[in-house]
């Protein structure tokens, strides 16, 4: 009885314990929710995107109020989604939050609860957004310092390490790079030595001043935030003393704004957090003060000699009415000024006396004059000047004849073929002068053939250069070519040549020569009749003794000309080469021009047929490869199928296969029975 009575008395207390346990569980779920990414990511994205317009120098209250309304709607939406997921009402959530003990709040929950308090209190929202704006400016400044080279030398790559990554350059490119680098170095060496250290010191000083100013602004915003929280806590205490309650009893229909108000009143705690591990020291009030909009006096920097736009980050410093330096302007202008740097040329002591927004035009002009220019154009101008001088030098070296016309200087490579390719005018002049000399009985002038050209027949040279169409050329070629062993000085010199083999044999008299053919060297017919042994020989390079030693036996018929077995000559026409087309070969005095005439044969392969055949072979090869791949794939599939049909090696495997088959059979039977049942039912109905 006593036990029952005690249990009956403890039932109301047990019900209260269950309610408190449920509220604690709901509170723990809410704390987990505000530390999760579902809560933090939307809020962080909203703050980073909207914090750009929050600036102490340009207080736009209307814009701030509109952004605060959007932020409050975002917080209300997130809380509503949490209540729907958990299956509770906003009133129950507020009741659970009232049991929250502020002393048990960790630093992580303090940081997570700050956005919730900012949604209810406008004075907390504005400093939070301004602090985020300054943090973004600090991140941009740090990134720009890293890009500009203001980092320790340990983190930088040396010149030797960067050269290892360069690709191999050709000698011409290497010489060009060396020339450009020498020209630049000779021009910029003195300027870089004088200004390098000063620029680095000035950049480091400007960066330090900007960082200190931004850190000071962060401290100021934290003070304002703490003050707003204190005021909210005092107002809440006064409302509690008067017996007023901000909660509503009708839990389901309670507005979400009242929930946020209750949470803000419950979590009226110190949410000021430091973003860096650096210890800050407040400046003395004697260095200069600036009163903010909320009435808090904060120490600011006064001894800054940085003009607007000196840093590469583009963060400008504004000034107040007293001339003291204020906080940097908003980050909207950070991206537009990146890359623009105009370092002040004065000393730090002189810059301290100047206002932060003013700059002297004389100093700007001086800096513009002292700015080193690039030397690429100079190098290009030097190269162009050298090219002009070289072109002028080549024009002055051109010789001038008696008539005043310029002559092109001759080259040694074209001297050997000069007489063959001479113009008709020059050849006509030569032919006009030669008859007069012959008539006077003087020595005939030597021909202008080169040393190498003298050894070749006219047949080969005509195939190289082309047929002579000018009558003057024919007139000029009527004179026999000069030889090394010939010393004839009159016109009867060609008559002293030994007779041909037929004339020596006495079979018939030599053909009578007309006066026009007396001194004319006829080109032998070298197509089919060149095999005739009775044809006169035109190779002047063979000695006369060798010509006379040729057999005079005519009973042996000439050998027929068969197909060409091989052609030793496989290159271009080069005078002086041992296998050049102009040289006669063999005892029959055949040259390669005669041999090449027989290449037009029915058995010769056509290039188009060769290409068609090659294409056909490629297609056949591709088809064979495709068939081979298909056969290989087929073999692999057969192997896999055979592996599945192999006899199981263990009893467990065999049982597994049998069970699988049984299950499939049962499923099929069940499906058939279901179909039959449906058909029977439809027939009965």
Swiss-Prot record:
Keywords noted in UniProt: Cell projection, Cilium, Coiled coil, Cytoplasm, Cytoskeleton
The organism's place on the tree of life at top rank: Eukaryota
Any one Pfam family match given in the protein's UniProt record, by short name: ARL2_Bind_BART
Amino acid composition bias (Low complexity), ranges on this chain: 287-310
Cell compartments where the protein resides: Cell projection, Cilium; Cytoplasm, Cytoskeleton, Cilium axoneme
Bias (Basic and acidic residues): 363-372, 439-456, 508-557
Tissue-wise expression: Expressed in amphid and phasmid ciliated neurons.
Annotated coiled-coil segments of the chain: 197-242
Biased composition (Polar residues): 410-434
UniProt-annotated stretches for the region Disordered: 1-20, 287-573
GO cellular component: axoneme; ciliary base
Similarity remark: Belongs to the CFAP36 family.
PANTHER family documented for this protein: CILIA- AND FLAGELLA-ASSOCIATED PROTEIN 36, PHOSPHODIESTERASE HL
Full protein name: Cilia- and flagella-associated protein 36
Organism: Caenorhabditis elegans
The gene coding this protein: cfap-36
